[in-house]
A protein has these predicted regions:
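Domain-scale recognition of soluble eukaryotic interaction modules
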Residues: 81-186
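Long, charged/polar, low-complexity intrinsically disordered N-terminal extensions
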Residues: 1-56, 60-63, 156, 164, ...
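Glycine-rich phosphate-binding loop and adjoining beta1-alpha1-beta2 segment
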Residues: 416-451
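Compact alpha/beta protein-protein interaction domains typified by the UBC
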Residues: 28-110, 125
């Protein structure tokens, strides 16, 4: 049943606003909006400088969840006596609904003041705290201080209507250096590749190449920048798409912090960036008169932090309207023939001069490798190395997936075995891979785990792999052996490989894990086997009373016993050891042991020197 009266918590929160004295005035008490939202209209004082954008007092619609103090609190500027423009830490003006008396552009108070998200949800203080932060936001907006030097760069909030469509690019510091080589190139064509047809990803557009010149599209000698997407993108048999790129001197923005709404506003921004729309841009648009919509990408240089060094090219895309051609109605030409000049004039009349035609901004994301793994990535020195995995069993699959999901792009896998149903208890692969080779199945999984992954699976023994005619061990930096097989260890050692060789193996029931790391061409794995021999014997003694699991009826064959949670604990710990020792160029033998309640400890650690 809907409660038609505000709760005691809501009333208590409103009473606390009295402590804000003359800074906050309630102009209309609570009113119920639907079943779950209460509206409180207030007037807030500008305690900052005089501003042409912000009045001395502004009216606000405050929407509060009926479950207060739980739930959201959102501040929207009123259309009458409110703030009509957009500032940083504020959502864009979405398409206005005329009967509403407020702008749908709430202040992002949790972003402006992250501590609000962690405040204790107390009826006495929550509404007061949010209102106090709104007052501070107004003050800083008036003073021009919402973005200060040292803050992370914030892009203008471009209003998006077609959220299903995304334009994806991959820019970093290296590509920015490449862009600087073409400083005089301001406009050109680009090529994009669509996601998998017939799926929800078919409207994901991956930019692949940028070209210079009106006649440069898809010409190798006209290529400026090409992104190195992984197999997830490059192997997809999908259609390409022609678009246009324009490089600006700064982010396309209308003061104080608003995305341009229409073509006249955007064309004015082009002029401010020393670009003439009819002379510099229109010749490229004339190549897109095919009755289809196309994408326009606007690029601009940015820094990671406000006031910092410019280090990256960022892009914002929009969807172009269908341009005029011979099928366009005659009424748009008015004295002009249906030729290039006539098409241009028709477009200016029906599209580019009209303020009522809104720009169709598209969701645009930088899916560079570093950006995609920023929530949990490895060091750059690890990510840039090329790995070879020998063995794609439970341990190998876990370690390989951890490395790739953490940003490793080049990782090949060698394994001749096929996946069996019993493997699923602790393997990264799934039931759809039963009966398939582990190596190529892992390749497929890693491709879908990280879109920049470019590794390969080889369905063969390591002996066969080393004998391949096109095999070149110099292309790898690290080899990780996860088989625990003495013959494989001996073979790797005999090759005198001038790289980092890592051997990992598990004890019974994943009680212990053995990690050996050696550098250079003098890899000696005999000492490794000798060093862990006593611990292997200890495994046998400790678990002598245990009966090994079997794989169904028939001829008895013991299986390696280990639970997936125990295995993943040791694998995760070994990742940290491997990363640390590679970065510090250490050679070592480390034995880690699983303890009680999910703990892992180092049982033995020996770091080798040249004399060892």
């Amino acid at each position: 049943m809907v409660n038609l009266e505000p709760s005691e918590s809501l009333l208590e929160g409103r009473r606390y606003l009295e402590w804000l004295a003359s800074d906050c005035e309630i102009i209309k008490d609570y009113s119920l909006q639907g079943e779950e939202i209460w509206l409180l209209k207030i007037r807030l004082k500008n305690n900052g400088r005089k501003s042409k954008y912000i009045p001395d007092y502004s009216d606000w619609h405050v929407f509060i969840d009926s479950k207060y103090p739980n739930g959201n609190i959102q501040f929207y500027p009123s259309k009458k006596n409110g703030i009509s423009c957009v500032f940083p830490h504020q959502s864009p003006h979405s398409e206005e609904i005329s009967e509403e008396d407020y702008f749908r552009s709430n202040i992002c108070l949790e972003q402006f003041s992250p501590s609000l998200e962690f405040d204790v949800e107390d009826a006495n203080s929550k509404l007061y705290n949010y209102t106090e932060k709104a007052l501070e936001w107004i003050k800083q907006a008036a003073n021009g201080d919402l973005l200060a030097d040292g803050d992370f760069f914030e892009k203008v909030a471009y209003p998006i209507k077609k959220f299903h469509k995304k334009v994806l690019f991959s820019e970093d510091e290296k590509s920015f250096v490449d862009w600087n080589k073409y400083e005089d190139e301001r406009v050109g064509f680009l090529n994009m590749k669509a996601g998998k047809p017939g799926t929800e990803y078919q409207d994901f557009w991956y930019v692949t190449d940028y070209y210079k010149g009106v006649s440069g599209y898809m010409k190798k000698d006209a290529t400026i920048i090409s992104y190195s997407w992984g197999k997830y993108v490059t192997d997809e048999k999908s259609r390409g798409e022609k678009g246009i790129w324009i490089k600006l001197l700064s982010m396309p923005c209308i003061k104080p912090w608003q995305a341009p709404k229409n073509w006249p506003q955007l064309i004015k921004i082009f002029e401010e960036n020393n670009l003439n729309f009819t002379e510099d841009v229109m010749p490229f648009l004339n190549n897109l008169r095919d009755r289809n919509s196309h994408v326009m990408m606007l690029g601009f240089p940015v820094s990671e932090r406000i006031g910092g060094q410019i280090s990256e090219m960022h892009w914002q895309s929009l969807e172009l309207p269908v341009l005029s051609d011979y099928k366009t109605p005659n009424r748009f030409f008015k004295g002009f023939q249906k030729n290039i000049k006539g098409f241009e004039m028709a477009d200016m009349r029906r599209i580019f001069f009209r303020e009522k035609i809104s720009l169709e901004w598209l969701s645009t994301k930088n899916w560079s490798p570093d950006n995609l793994v920023s929530r949990g990535n490895l060091s750059k020195d690890i990510k840039k190395r090329k790995f070879l995995f020998v063995g794609a069993g439970a341990l190998g699959s876990m370690l390989a997936e951890m490395l790739v999901r953490s940003g490793v792009i080049q990782l090949d896998i060698v394994d001749y075995d096929v996946l069996e149903m019993g493997n699923l208890t602790r393997h990264s692969l799934t039931a759809s891979d039963i009966g398939k080779y582990k190596a190529t199945s892992m390749e497929k999984k890693l491709i879908e785990s990280f879109i920049h992954y470019r590794g390969k699976g080889f369905n063969m023994t390591v002996e066969e792999f080393f004998k391949k005619q096109d095999f070149d061990m110099n292309e790898y930096d690290v080899i990780i052996e996860t088989t625990g097989n003495d013959k494989v260890l001996d073979l790797i050692a005999s090759k005198k490989l001038n790289l980092i060789v890592i051997s990992t193996s598990l004890g019974l029931y994943a009680k212990r894990m053995y990690i050996n790391i050696q550098h250079g061409s003098k890899v000696e794995l005999t000492k490794f086997k000798e060093s862990i021999l006593e611990w292997i014997e200890k495994d046998r003694e400790e678990f002598s009373h245990m009966e090994y699991p079997r794989d169904g009826l028939g001829c008895w064959h013991p299986l390696f016993p280990a639970r997936i949670d125990h295995l993943s604990m040791l694998a995760s710990s070994s990742m940290s050891i491997i990363e640390s020792d590679i970065l510090q160029t250490k050679e070592s033998l480390t034995i880690i042991e699983r303890g009680e309640l999910g703990t892992v400890s180092i049982l033995k650690r020996k770091e080798f020197t040249d004399g060892d």
